[in-house]
UniProtKB/Swiss-Prot annotation:
The record marks H130, Q352 as: Interaction with tRNA. It catalyses: S-sulfanyl-L-cysteinyl-[protein] + uridine(34) in tRNA + AH2 + ATP = 2-thiouridine(34) in tRNA + L-cysteinyl-[protein] + A + AMP + diphosphate + H(+). The active site is at C105 (nucleophile), C204 (cysteine persulfide intermediate). This is tRNA-specific 2-thiouridylase MnmA. Catalyzes the 2-thiolation of uridine at the wobble position (U34) of tRNA, leading to the formation of s(2)U34. Residues 153-155, 310-311 are annotated as: Interaction with tRNA. Pfam families: tRNA_Me_trans, tRNA_Me_trans_C, tRNA_Me_trans_M. It comes from Desulfitobacterium hafniense (strain Y51). Its main location: cytoplasm.
Length: 370
C-alpha cells in the first residue's frame, strides 16, 4: 500500500487479544489506525466489574495502543447502549423471549452509531476483532459475509443483520487466522497481558451471568409469580416469574412433577409458563421476522439453506418460505418467513436469531417469533 493509497481505519478496541491484534495487523499492513474504546457500562453501575468495557479493559486497550504507536480515544456510549441494548434485553425477557443482546448491539451500537462516528472522523473503515470475513463481487459490488478460517470461533451468527453499506466499510483482520495463532502473535509482539486474557463468555454488561438478578433490580414490579400449566391449561404448580425460565429448560423449575418436564413456551398475558415432556420441545418449523438479507436481495419463493437457531447450534438443513401479507401477524416486524427443517430442532426459542447459510456464505437471518 503506497502512501497515496493509505486508508484510515477506526478499530473498536475492547482491551482483549482479538481487537488488539486487529489493530496491530492493520498497522502492519500500512493503514492509518485509530483505536477507540466504547464506554457502555450502565450509568450508576459499577465501572470495574471485569467486562469488556470496564475501567480495566479500557486501560488495557490504551496500553496496547501506546505499544502500537496509535492514537486511542474513549467514547461515552452509555446512553445509546442503555436505551437500545439493555432496555431491549430487559423488555424481551419480561415478554417471555430469550433475547440476543449482541446482535442488537452490533446493529445499533457498533455498526450504527459507532460506524457513523468513525465516518465522521474521516475513517474509510471500521474494524473489529470478530472472526468473520467480508468478500465483495468486483462486478456487482455486492458484499458477502463469509465464515472465517477458524470455524470454531465463527461469529457470523452475531453479524447477520449488517447491511450492504455497513459491510462495505468493515474490515475483519482476523478472518484468516486461528485463535491460538492470534494469541501467539500477540505474545510475539510484546502484547503479553492481552495475549493471556481469557475469552469472554458472558454478556458484557452482566459479567457474573446472573441476568435474573440484573432484570429484577431494574424492573422488580414487573416480575410476578404465576402458574405452570400444560398445553391444555391445567395448572401444574407455581413459578417465580417468567424471567427465570427459557424454552427447553428442565433444571431449576423449583417444582417436582413426578416425571421430567420442560419449558415449552409462555402465555405472557396470563403470566403462565407452559410445560411439557421432552418430545414436545422439538419442532419442525419456526416463523421469523425483522429479516436482513446479505447474499441475496430477498426471498421471492422457497429457498433451501442451512439454518442455525442459536449461536453454538449446529447447522441444520431447512427451507425458507416467504409468507404473503404477513406483516400483520403477531410479533411481525416487516415480512415474515416460515422455516421448515428436514429434522426436528430442539428448543426453538422466540427472541433468538435464526441465521441462514449456503456453503460458507451468510444468506441472511431474522428474529424468531414462534
Amino acid at each position: 500500500m503506497t502512501l497515496t493509497e493509505k486508508k484510515k481505519v477506526v478499530v473498536g478496541m475492547s482491551g482483549g487479544v482479538d481487537s488488539s491484534m486487529a489493530a496491530a495487523l492493520l498497522k502492519e499492513e500500512g493503514y492509518e489506525v485509530i483505536g477507540i474504546t466504547l464506554q457502555t457500562m450502565p450509568s450508576g453501575g459499577p465501572d470495574d466489574v471485569g467486562g469488556c468495557c470496564s475501567i480495566t479493559a479500557i486501560d488495557d486497550a490504551r496500553r496496547v495502543a501506546h505499544q502500537l504507536g496509535i492514537p486511542h480515544y474513549v467514547l461515552n456510549f452509555r446512553t445509546i447502549f442503555d436505551e437500545n441494548v439493555i432496555d431491549y434485553f430487559t423488555n424481551a425477557y419480561l415478554s417471555g423471549e430469550t433475547p440476543n443482546p449482541c446482535t442488537m448491539c452490533n446493529r445499533v451500537v457498533r455498526w450504527g452509531e459507532f460506524l457513523r462516528k468513525a465516518r465522521a472522523l474521516g475513517a474509510d473503515y471500521l474494524a473489529t476483532g470478530h472472526y468473520a470475513k467480508v468478500l465483495q463481487d468486483p462486478q456487482s459490488g455486492r458484499c458477502f459475509l463469509s465464515r472465517p478460517t477458524d470455524t470454531w470461533k465463527d461469529q457470523t451468527y452475531m453479524l447477520y443483520n449488517l447491511t450492504q453499506d455497513q459491510l462495505k466499510h468493515t474490515l475483519f483482520p482476523l478472518a484468516d487466522y486461528k485463535k491460538e495463532h492470534i494469541r501467539e502473535m500477540a505474545a510475539e509482539r510484546g502484547l503479553l497481558r492481552v495475549s493471556r486474557k481469557p475469552d469472554s463468555q458472558e454478556i458484557c454488561f452482566i459479567p457474573d451471568d446472573d441476568y435474573v438478578s440484573f432484570i429484577r433490580e431494574r424492573s422488580p414490579e414487573k416480575i410476578k409469580p404465576g402458574n405452570f400449566v400444560d398445553r391444555q391449561g391445567n395448572i401444574l404448580g407455581r413459578h417465580q416469574g417468567l424471567i427465570n425460565y427459557t424454552v427447553g429448560q428442565r433444571k431449576g423449575l423449583g417444582v417436582t412433577f413426578g416425571k421430567p418436564m420442560f419449558v415449552l413456551g409462555f402465555n405472557v398475558e396470563g403470566n403462565e409458563v407452559i410445560l411439557g415432556e421432552d418430545q414436545e420441545v422439538y419442532a419442525h418449523t419456526l416463523l421469523a421476522t425483522d429479516l436482513n438479507w446479505i447474499a441475496i436481495p430477498g426471498v421471492e419463493g422457497p429457498l433451501t439453506v442451512q439454518a442455525k437457531i442459536r449461536y453454538k447450534a449446529p447447522l441444520a438443513e431447512a427451507k425458507i418460505i416467504p409468507l404473503k401479507d404477513s406483516e400483520t401477524l403477531p410479533g411481525a416486524i416487516g415480512p415474515v418467513v416460515r422455516v421448515e427443517f428436514t429434522t426436528p430442532q430442539r428448543a426453538i426459542t422466540p427472541g433468538q436469531a435464526v441465521v441462514f447459510y449456503q456453503g460458507e456464505l451468510v444468506v441472511g437471518g431474522g428474529k424468531i417469533i414462534t
